[in-house]
């Protein structure tokens, strides 16, 4: 008897719409691969009942809080249900950009200079020391919530008088916010599938940076896979990504986003342990370049579930 698979999609995070699209694609791909899969939306179904509903395994196609941050993973482990992607700790760390950066920095890996602020500090008014630290980053900077995905709540700040508004927006989404030095070079993403690192992708957004619209709505964002790097650069990038992935304790599948600055140095941005799987998504694109169909990709991700 084949396993009955729950594809978790939708949910209640800010990335619900993206997740519904990802989940629909994953569901179709699994069924094409002969898998007995069914959609389950945690917004409508009590996921503590998955086992009593007869499911033996879970494919997590949720993005953001409640699906990608370790909470769901912990519950599935308590229930004894195997699931796709990283475990509790790696999921929680990857969702938290600040703590990812601290870990990577501690491991000697390159990250962009940043200043972290809490909502309480912002509401009280920033100290002279904090203002000096922010000023030392130079302009432009990028302001982002620490625990939000899909570039939700993120802004590029090019003038000092725009910083307060950018912080206000970011604090609508999280208690902690990062102000990061703007890196001017191209952005790359590298997907990981089991032990395999897939070909890197270079991202060229039509706007200022790779924001929510560029990720999911724009037809003008350009993707290059292969990324056009020299063989030695591609090897350096893959080695950096593998180190970043293992430092966080990630497993199964996911991707890591990286910037190449004008100084020729790669800088780690963030890890995604449950990336998008829509028509615009990057992991399927990298898999295609490696000779793998979408259906083969999702079946392989499911095989890696434990």
From Swiss-Prot:
InterPro entries: ATP-grasp, ATP_grasp_subdomain_1, D-Ala_lig_Van_CS, D_ala_D_ala, Dala_Dala_lig_C, Dala_Dala_lig_N, PreATP-grasp_dom_sf. One of its GO terms (cellular component) is cytosol. It catalyses: 2 D-alanine + ATP = D-alanyl-D-alanine + ADP + phosphate + H(+). Mg(2+) 2 binds at residues 270, 272. Its cofactor is Mg(2+); Mn(2+). One of its GO terms (biological process) is peptidoglycan biosynthetic process. Binds 2 magnesium or manganese ions per subunit. Pathway: Cell wall biogenesis; peptidoglycan biosynthesis. Mg(2+) 1 binds at residues 257, 270. Keywords: ATP-binding, Cell shape, Cell wall biogenesis/degradation, Cytoplasm, Ligase, Magnesium, Manganese, Metal-binding, Nucleotide-binding, Peptidoglycan synthesis. The active site is at residues 15, 150, 281. ATP binds at residues 134-189. Signal peptide: none annotated. It is found in: Cytoplasm. It comes from the Bacteria. Pfam families: Dala_Dala_lig_C (PF07478), Dala_Dala_lig_N (PF01820). Its main location: cytoplasm. The keyword Lyase does not apply. GO terms for molecular function: ATP binding; D-alanine-D-alanine ligase activity; metal ion binding; protein homodimerization activity. Cell wall formation. Belongs to the D-alanine--D-alanine ligase family. This is D-alanine--D-alanine ligase B. It comes from Escherichia coli (strain K12).
């Amino acid at each position: 008897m084949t396993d009955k698979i729950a594809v978790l999609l939708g949910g209640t995070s800010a990335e619900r719409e993206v997740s519904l699209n990802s989940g629909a694609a994953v569901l179709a791909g699994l069924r094409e691969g002969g898998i007995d899969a069914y959609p389950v939306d945690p917004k409508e179904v009590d996921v503590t009942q998955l086992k009593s509903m007869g499911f033996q395994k879970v494919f997590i196609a949720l993005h953001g809080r409640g699906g990608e941050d370790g909470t769901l993973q912990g519950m599935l482990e308590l229930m004894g249900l195997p699931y796709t992607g990283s475990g509790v700790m790696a999921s929680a760390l990857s969702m938290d950009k600040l703590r990812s950066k601290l870990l990577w920095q501690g491991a000697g890996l390159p990250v962009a200079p940043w200043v972290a602020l809490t909502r309480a500090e912002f509401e009280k008014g920033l100290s002279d020391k904090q203002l000096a630290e922010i000023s030392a980053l130079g302009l432009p900077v990028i302001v982002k919530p620490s625990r939000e995905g899909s570039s939700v709540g993120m802004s590029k700040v090019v003038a000092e008088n725009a910083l307060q508004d950018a912080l206000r927006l970011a604090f609508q989404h999280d208690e902690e916010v990062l102000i990061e030095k703007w890196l001017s070079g191209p952005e790359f993403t590298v997907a990981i599938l089991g032990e395999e690192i897939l070909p890197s992708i270079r991202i060229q957004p039509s706007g200022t940076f790779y924001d929510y619209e560029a990720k999911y709505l724009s037809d003008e964002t350009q993707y290059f896979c292969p990324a056009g790097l020299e063989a030695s650069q591609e090897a350096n990038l893959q080695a950096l990504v593998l180190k970043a992935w293992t430092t966080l304790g990630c497993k199964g599948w996911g991707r890591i986003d990286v910037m190449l600055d004008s100084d020729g140095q790669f800088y780690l941005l963030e890890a995604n342990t449950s990336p998008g799987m829509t028509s615009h998504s990057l992991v399927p694109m990298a898999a295609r370049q490696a000779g793998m169909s979408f259906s083969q990709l999702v079946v392989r991700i499911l095989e890696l579930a434990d």
